[in-house]
Amino acid sequence: MQDFSNLVEEVENTLIPYFRKIEKRALFNQEKVLNAFHHVKASESDLQGSTGYGYDDFGRDHLEQIYAHTFKADDALVRPQIISGTHAITLALQSTLKNNDELLYITGSPYDTLLEVIGINGNGVESLKEYGVRYNEVELRDGRIDIPKVITAINDNTKVVAIQRSKGYDQRPSITINEIEQAITSIKEVYPNIIIFVDNCYGEFVEDKEPIEVGADLIAGSLIKNPGGGLAKIGGYIAGRQDL
């Protein structure tokens, strides 16, 4: 029994540096969120909700300002009517892509649920494809963004370059914020007007920076995941440039 106790202690001591790193990052991001609450002067009255009369909902307005400030975005849309991350991503793509525009995913194929949104799977009804949006993708190279191939794949019709930050259900590594920054910098040097969209699901607060801080124009995610702290049953957000 003593040998087992020693083994447990040895393993715990081995893991201490990793847990300290996680705790440090958690405190950093907690401070960032608290600073956002302070910046917008959120108060108890914001938690009272709305009766439905009138058009003003200060609690909702402040919540969206908090998200915008936290993610370093111009503006944010945070609503329970956005029921999931897929819904948020769909809204972001539909708002930026029109007939004959091309959507280019540079992290390989997205989630299965998004394949129906794009029009690759399913009956195509109300999909991007039905509205004349083209689709192309660039596979990862050894689990990383193949930047030279991405630059080559972009054409005159490419309107949005999309990055899926999380590995999702694949076996590949998730895309780090440093890698996202390298890809965005390289793309923007050649195509400064292209829109960079990042699917930020599962990626919020796992690093010190968020995609907008490294050049992304638009991000979207789910409140059911990291931002909801495991408490939210529904909701999603979109954040980024105000003109988008």
Language-model segments: residues:
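Structural signal for short hydrophobic segments within the conserved structured cores
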Residues: 77-78, 136
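Acidic, PIN/NYN-like endoribonuclease modules and their adjacent C-terminal/linker elements
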Residues: 26-30
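Active-site-flanking structural segment that lines cofactor/substrate pockets
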Residues: 47-77
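Conserved PLP-enzyme active-site core in the AAT-like
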Residues: 2-16, 23, 33-39, 43-46, ...
